[in-house]
Amino acid sequence: MGLSRFNQDATCFVTSSEGNSVTIYNCDPFGKCFEMVDEDTQNIGDDDARGDDNSGGDDDLLVEMLFSTNLVAIVHRKQGILKSKKLKIVNIKRKTIICELSFPHPIQDVVMNRKRVCVLLNSDQIHIYDISCMKHLHTIDIWDSQVKSITGQGVDSLSNSGTSNMTSLRERSSTFSKSISPKICLSNDDRSILAFNCYSTSSKSVILNDVVIFDALNISPLNYINSVHKGNVASLAISPDGKFIATASEKGTLVRIFNTGAETESELLTPLLYEFRRGNRPCNINQLTFNSDSTLLGCVGDSDTIHIFKLDSTSRLLSMSVNSEDNSHITSEDIKALRKDPNSKQFTKLISKTIKKSIPSQALRRDFAHITIKNTKTKHILGFPKEFMNQVYVLSNDGSFFIYSLPSTSGSCVLSKQNDFK
């Protein structure tokens, strides 16, 4: 059984079979809502089936829900190279295709809310659409020097390097494993804050450890956070209101939470808010997710423990005071100039300054709550229901759905209910 995901407020979840069935379940009370057999997976021609599958992911189908509506986005990831380039918006209740979009490269991921649909291709491009009419609004090329210019990162070095060097960097990135390919996430609210990680380049290496914050509603850049980890960013999440992003390192031992700067300009001055240690042993982080009011962060990996971190004032990092004689930090005037004219030379001045990093005044904190996984060979995803703030949902690709109660104090979550959907 393929494992897809919860909807934006964890009231429902969607699963896909290894064949062509897409099913939506209600979480509480538990029950099947809709089921659709997608005829597009049948009678696949030989020409369509040939070719490498570079779309990434473990599931045959990529399915993204739009809250509790009948609309879902569907991508066939392993039904041939042609189908992996095609996105369908489907009314699963009526079993009709609303629209169908074709792209030049396989689709890596799809995220959407009530205003925007964002599509990530494995060619490192992001396409932004107006969901009301599916009009194409903007394309972001993660490798494009324009993205670097918008965010103020290395404009001159990229421009002077020439096309051949850019092509070389793209080819070098294609050797990466699928687990460290670019990630995208979109806030649930109508402000539609988009976050994605991008490449930090040098003459010897290409690392996916920078994060861009983009206003997908107004099609404008908001922030650029460089070197959020020493290595690649393995997982990325944004809070429902778009105020915070969470990142996990490729090693899987550290989880960090930053201000996106979407709320106020002053937030950009000290972007790092929280830093947690997941564990000492390496782990592949598959999912990070915030609860509805951004007070909890769930972390799911391939270890035997699901971690839940508490985001409160006691866990927040304290910044060291900046030396008054040191003018190398970013000021609010810099940020105002950045947003007023994103093509000005202010970017060079801005990026040349040393960002004063937040330094923790205490040892890194551990999780507030945890869930022990009995079968580590199965894949799990986590959901925080908005309706029931003291509960946590866990979905397993062996066909099990668990409801846990959060502890009042630090400790283990208590299993309160289990359902099967095989």
From Swiss-Prot:
> Where on this chain is L/FRRG motif (motif)?
276-280
* Protein name as catalogued: Autophagy-related protein 21
Ranges: WD repeats = 1-35, 102-153, 166-206, 228-268, 280-319, 374-414
Function per UniProt:
Required for cytoplasm to vacuole transport (Cvt) vesicles formation and mitophagy. Involved in binding of phosphatidylethanolamine to ATG8 and in recruitment of ATG8 and ATG5 to the pre-autophagosomal structure. Protects ATG8 from ARG4-mediated cleavage.
**GO BP, one annotated term:** cytoplasm to vacuole targeting by the Cvt pathway
User: Which superkingdom is the protein from?
Assistant: Eukaryota
SMART domains the UniProt entry points to: WD40
Record's subcellular location: Cytoplasm; Membrane; Vacuole membrane
Transmembrane regions: none
- Please give one Gene Ontology molecular function term for this protein: phosphatidylinositol-3,5-bisphosphate binding
Q: Which family does it belong to?
A: Belongs to the WD repeat PROPPIN family.
Q: Name one GO cellular component term.
A: fungal-type vacuole membrane
List the source organism: Vanderwaltozyma polyspora (strain ATCC 22028 / DSM 70294 / BCRC 21397 / CBS 2163 / NBRC 10782 / NRRL Y-8283 / UCD 57-17)
